[in-house]
Amino acid sequence: MSTHDMNHHPPRKSHSKRDKPSSSNSGPKIENHKCKWAWQKVFETGKSFLRRDGFPQDCKSKEDFERIKRTGVRKTSENMLEDPRKNFESLQQSSVYQTNSFRNPRYLCRAHLRVDSYYCTIPPKREVSLFNMDDNCTEVLLRDFAKDCGKVEKAYVCIHPETKRHMKMAYVKFATVKEAHNFYSMYHAQNLLATKCTPRIDPFLSILNEEYEVATNGQVLPILPDDLASIDPSVLRDLRANFLRDQNEKYELAMRNTYEDEGGMLSGVIMDTSDHYERDYTMDHDVGPSSMKMSPIPPPPIKEESPPPPPPPPVASVSNLAPVPSVQLPYYNNIQPSSSTMHMPEFRPTEPPPSYSREDPYRSTSRSSLSRHRNRSRSPSDGMDRSGRSSSRRTHRRPESRNGSKNANGDVVKYETYKMEKRKIKYEGGNKKYEQVHIKERTAVIRGKNQLENVSSESASGSSSVDTYPDFSDEERKKKKRPKSPNRSKKDSRAFGWDSTDESDEDTRRRRSGRSQNRSSERKFQTTSSSSTRRELSSTHTNSVPNLKSHETPPPPPPKGHPSVHLQTPYQHVQPQMIPATYYNLPPQHMAPPPITTSLPPFCDFSQPPPGFTPTFKPITNAPLPTPYQASNIPQPGLVQIAALSAAPEPFSSIPGPPPGPAPIQEDVGRAESPEKPSLSERFSGIFGPTQREEPAQVEVEYDYPLKHSESHDDRHSLEDMDVEVSSDGETVSNVEKIECMEEKKRQDLERIAIARTPIVKKCKKRMMDELSRKVAEDIRQQIMRQCFAALDEKLHLKAIADEEKRKKEREEKARQEAEKPSNHLIADMMTLYNNQSFASSSRGFYRKQKPIPKSHPKHQEHHHHAKASVSTPVHSSSTSRNSSVAPTPQRTVSTSSSSSSAATSARVSEDESDSDSTPGEVQRRKTSVLSNDKRRRRASFSSTSIQSSPERQRDVSSSSRTSSSSSTSSMKQEETADEKSRKRKLIMSSDESSTTGSTATSVVSSRQSSLEPQQEKTDGEPPKKKSQTDFISERVSKIEGEERPLPEPVETSGPIIGDSSYLPYKIVHWEKAGIIEMNLPANSIRAHEYHPFTTEHCYFGIDDPRQPKIQIFDHSPCKSEPGSEPLKITPAPWGPIDNVAETGPLIYMDVVTAPKTVQKKQKPRKQVFEKDPYEYYEPPPTKRPAPPPRFKKTFKPRSEEEKKKIIGDCEDLPDLEDQWYLRAALNEMQSEVKSADELPWKKMLTFKEMLRSEDPLLRLNPIRSKKGLPDAFYEDEELDGVIPVAAGCSRARPYEKMTMKQKRSLVRRPDNESHPTAIFSERDETAIRHQHLASKDMRLLQRRLLTSLGDANNDFFKINQLKFRKKMIKFARSRIHGWGLYAMESIAPDEMIVEYIGQTIRSLVAEEREKAYERRGIGSSYLFRIDLHHVIDATKRGNFARFINHSCQPNCYAKVLTIEGEKRIVIYSRTIIKKGEEITYDYKFPIEDDKIDCLCGAKTCRGYLN
């Protein structure tokens, strides 16, 4: 993009390259050029600004230009838009730009582009990966920590898919890049959960995915963010691989620059090595799994007088090649072959044997083309760094059988080697260390052909690996471990080797970055000039080393040497070689080497440094070709003379000599062409010059040590089928080796598992059989016990049935005997049991046609008082003779059976006392007389109830009634002061005490005669009008007093009572034996359900009398009634309903007296009128309140003028309405006195308008409550809803007033009935809890079986399971202590588990924050239960019934902490016996604090405070 006015506003540094004017970018070329940074108008609401976006706008017409110009953009001469930043100040002065606002484009929001297969921009760095983090960090905690930095879209913590353990890795994705960077900066400097983690900005989660694959053996991240999950997996894999390669390139470039800076300090130092030579020296070199690897040749000798060199740097892989004196010369691989006429055969390798196919299926086709080896220098620190990572150890054992063949023409050499390989590999994979040992047997066949090849082109020496090796996926690339040491100069080095050419670091970088389409290791060489030729030889070890191709790790670049003049690279820098300057001096440049003999060591070129060191001198590009220099005392290398090389004219033609002087190292720039592959003869001729046609001397080599790889120097391509496991660090181990190691380890593991499986299986099987047999035996034993118990229960049941039958027979016999005995009981005893309450029901408002005994008026209660008092204090009546019954009575009185029973009791007691002093004959006569008197009295009692009874019988009864009444009256006066409550309680007496006197007949007669009128009224067909108790009694008493009763007819004293047709036969038995007698004698008694005594378990009234009452049983059919006779019936009581019913009132059943039937006329059916139930409650009719008296009207005397003026003058606030009326009157009077408005001070007529004060809002009598039950609306005005009527205007304006304990207790919610010590539960609640217990019957059965099988029931594990499946019956209700409480619905024994305290387990720090928050909200912290020092259970919002347990200073429960499966739980145990309905409490054990909390438990030992 063309710009102008560069001096006016200099561009920013970030756009300096784009803003530079270029002469080539002119004319129409700019118009057609698609510039990345063009300016485009962007419209927003209220703003218009420019930004860089898309292609430049091409103004093709004037209208377009005018449209753009209106927005303030100028046009250049090339018809392009101008950068508005160049002349922004001038634009501000222009009228066009005054209405527009410009903003810098860097402040614009970056668009979130979708990542897909077409994504090619900078990756969005919104993902942050975390490594080495605390394993306690969860996704929730990580998200909480990340929220402090910005919006979190996704947070994930890596969990191992197999072990389900925390992998200490996670990632967080933010909404923006800035937020991700803030998070990275924050936790790069501080800890995350007390652990220093390693955050990384990780686009596409590339680094995290790679580490996850290493840890999980190739599995990818299971959970990704939404945008990454929507990408195709192959596309995402490529994006991750590109990002990782870019990161590796940046790291390599930084390390190379650091290395160059360090190496430049020692550059330029050149020292002469003519006076020095080396001793015998073994180089410990690294070997790696590379197809370019060849072993180095032995080092040249050094003069003895020279000081010994320092020891080489320790390398981890020296143990396998230590006995061989081989030193790698790093410059031999850079020697270029020269043109020569020397005929050297070039050997072509054969195909590898089939045993090699398991390592690499592509190796056999690529060895001939990929046999070039590169070498690179290493610093001592480099070797030290890699020595600790991994190592590979290998030993080769060569057998005695060696074969060599040659054909007739002498052009083919066949060499066979049989060897045994033993390698030991140690390397690190992730955080794991692997160590494996391999033993292999290999066979190599070498064939060669005598021919010469000229180096004509670059393509002949090496070919691309596209044809031989396929593309490798990024997963295989990512398995290569990145370096961890920052002092490595090249992290992608693979092995040492010799090559005829050199490769630059740029080539290595490009190979590492995978910019080529095939993503494989291509080798392209460039022909070198004739002045820079090198030679290449192979030692015996080089011939025995195969060429392994590792497609995982790219080969390292060769050491940087002297670049050629005609080469141009993107980075004009040289990688220096470092060497100590004190030991290696340069030899003379043109010194001729001495002849080589068998006794002398080979040549050595001292112009080259020894292996393992780098030179500190600058490269000499124009140095002449040096003459080979011979060094003495060098041990003979293990070289074998090959007949095919006999064309060499001189002895040194077949033995490698020293290299020439330092030659420039060639660097490859384009790698577009590949040189031809030179032959061995050409390389020899390029090194030593033209060969002569002399036969070389046969060299016989003797070694003091066994040769392991003594082979010919014909060609390195003849070793294609040899396999050598080379050693390197953990990052240069090939994928093949890793696969082999993993397979070998898996195989070994499977073998160990197979060996250990059999005994383990046997042990497990034996243990299972023993356990199974034990269980089966236990089950059989339990089954036998159950069968035995069942049989025993059946026998016991049969025995119980037999005993019951025996007891039944005995009872029948006893009842039969009792029935035969004469009975001397009265029917009144039966009547006392049938009171009104025995027929009553709580759910009914009526009684079964039976009205209760009226509670007599005080003035008519004397006889009742006497009757009740005579029970507690028996009086021995003086009238106990037989003639006392005929004494006359002055008047009739109303008496009851209970009053007559008292007299009978006294009479019977006196008779018993007189019996004790008499003879047996007298006693027998008295018994007969008493029996006849009893029969006579009973007959009189029943005959008096009948209307048809004779007058004689009535007179007899009347006389006896008078006698008993007089005696009752005399005794009543003596006991009139007795307690009324005891009289009520002693009203009911037994039949024995009430059956020996004749007063009962009198009471029955009087009661019966008083009820004749109601009976007559009922026969008229109209229902009797119910009366009150007082009216009924007063009416009856008046009738009795006013009427004159005829004397009754005397009653016979002999004969059975059951013979009378008007009597209902009966017998007196004990109430407990009534059911038995009814079963035994069904024909002579009524059934049990017809009398239903009140003392059974279903009744709610206890027996006040300690003596067991007896009841009277009527006979159903005492005699056959004659046809036409009236049946015997029991009539209801003759009294009407009463208001107050006594607790114990006897019900007397009497014969039904029917009037003679009269013919009645048929009447029209009337509407049925239901009587009102006298026992129902009726609301009283509403009464109108009387009208209030009229208010007294206040009158005030009129004020004087002075008082009015004073009021007006003293008015500071708004005057009230009365004062305003006075002001109005004063204004009107003033204005009326003037003729015109001009005479007024204010020059116009005014109208007074009153100002009303705002009245106080009306308060509601009953404030409206909110949904939570709190008062919300206090005023009638709806606008004042929520306003509290406080005089100060705000509740915060009121001072704090501490409430007393009494005030606090008045505010605590209490149950409705605090007097009840225990809670009362409904039947519905108990039924629901009982059904829940029945539903868990199967679980309890399983629990018992488990306890029985294990035998140990004291373990906490079983206790907690018992708690789970056998919960106690508990319920929460209002507590008298505070709020809600937990109550027991069943009796609980001591030390039994009641309930578990369930809640949310939180840490102590979180508990403190929640406690503060709860206190601010008024909830309180009473639901926080501390387990230990670090954990607290919070049941405030999540819990069960246990959180309702209140505190008590004298609790009946205690809390215990149990550990179940590593998790601590709190269980509530019972301390004492807890009865049904008692509240469950335990001691909160709050720590002692200054701010006291009052305790409301109310226990005897209450401390007063919880804390």
From Swiss-Prot:
A motif (RxxxRR motif) lies at residues 1340-1345. Gene3D superfamilies: 3.30.70.330, SET domain. Keywords: Chromatin regulator, Developmental protein, Methyltransferase, Nucleus, RNA-binding, S-adenosyl-L-methionine, Transcription, Transcription regulation, Transferase. Residues 1491-1507 form the Post-SET domain. Its main location: nucleus. It catalyses: L-lysyl(4)-[histone H3] + 3 S-adenosyl-L-methionine = N(6),N(6),N(6)-trimethyl-L-lysyl(4)-[histone H3] + 3 S-adenosyl-L-homocysteine + 3 H(+); N(6)-methyl-L-lysyl(4)-[histone H3] + S-adenosyl-L-methionine = N(6),N(6)-dimethyl-L-lysyl(4)-[histone H3] + S-adenosyl-L-homocysteine + H(+); N(6),N(6)-dimethyl-L-lysyl(4)-[histone H3] + S-adenosyl-L-methionine = N(6),N(6),N(6)-trimethyl-L-lysyl(4)-[histone H3] + S-adenosyl-L-homocysteine + H(+). It is found in: Nucleus. Residues 316-327, 456-465, 869-908, 958-971, 990-1007 have a biased composition (Low complexity). Residues 331-342, 566-575, 941-951 have a biased composition (Polar residues). Residues 413-444, 668-680, 803-823, 973-982, 1015-1047 have a biased composition (Basic and acidic residues). The keyword Repeat does not apply. InterPro entries: COMPASS_Set1_N-SET, Nucleotide-bd_a/b_plait_sf, Post-SET_dom, RBD_domain_sf, RRM_dom, Set1-like, SET_dom, SET_dom_sf. Residues 9-18, 478-488, 846-868 have a biased composition (Basic residues). One of its GO terms (molecular function) is histone H3K4 trimethyltransferase activity. One of its GO terms (cellular component) is nucleus. PROSITE patterns: POST_SET, SET. SUPFAM superfamilies: RNA-binding domain, RBD (SSF54928), SET domain (SSF82199). Signal peptide: none annotated. S-adenosyl-L-methionine binds at Y1484. Residues 1-32, 280-578, 650-697, 803-826, 842-1058, 1163-1199 are annotated as: Disordered. Belongs to the class V-like SAM-binding methyltransferase superfamily. Component of the Set1C/COMPASS complex (also known as the SET2 complex), which contains at least set-2, swd-2.1, cfp-1, rbbp-5, wdr-5.1, dpy-30 and ash-2. Catalytic component of the COMPASS (Set1C) complex that specifically mono-, di- and trimethylates histone H3 to form H3K4me1/2/3. Binds RNAs which might negatively affect its histone methyltransferase activity. COMPASS recognizes ubiquitinated H2B on one face of the nucleosome which stimulates the methylation of H3 on the opposing face. H3 'Lys-4' methylation represents a specific tag for epigenetic transcriptional activation. Implicated in the epigenetic inheritance of lifespan over several generations. This is Histone-lysine N-methyltransferase set-2. The gene is set-2.
